[in-house]
Amino acid sequence: MDPQSAVYSLPRVPTAAPPNAGVPWSHVGEVAVLSFVALICIYLLYLWVLRDLILVLKARRGRSTEELIFGSEAVDRRSPIPNTLEPTAPVHPGPFVPGSG
């Protein structure tokens, strides 16, 4: 066998595939998992800490926590609602007698 024919009789070995220019999928998966965990942590932080902190800060500004309404329907304490249901005659309750009823 001469050297010229030996080249053609050797098995062909495929060359390595060219490297991808994109990001490997394992890196994309890591970023997705870390983003999901961070989102859950922020949500739990809001549930356990930030929501109560917002209520405390609003209560310190002069409102009780029962009056807190978020948005445009907030209570205006400068003009209180007048009491229109004043009694026409004085009410004098009778003495309390136990067992009478």
Curated annotation (Swiss-Prot):
Purpose of the protein: Involved in the viral transport within, and between cells.
GO BP annotation list: transport of virus in host, cell to cell
Transmembrane segments: 30-50
Location of the region described as Disordered in the Swiss-Prot/TrEMBL record: 78-101
The protein's name: Movement protein
Gene Ontology CC: host cell membrane; membrane
Family designation: Belongs to the mastrevirus movement protein family.
Subcellular localization, as worded in the UniProt entry: Host membrane
Pfam families given in the database record: Gemini_mov (PF01708)
Entry keywords, A to Z: Host membrane, Membrane, Transmembrane, Transmembrane helix, Transport, Viral movement protein
Bilayer disposition of the protein: Single-pass membrane protein
Secretion signal, residue range per the UniProt entry: none
Complex formation: Interacts with the capsid protein (CP). Part of a MP-CP-viral DNA complex.
Pro residues composition bias: residue spans: 90-101
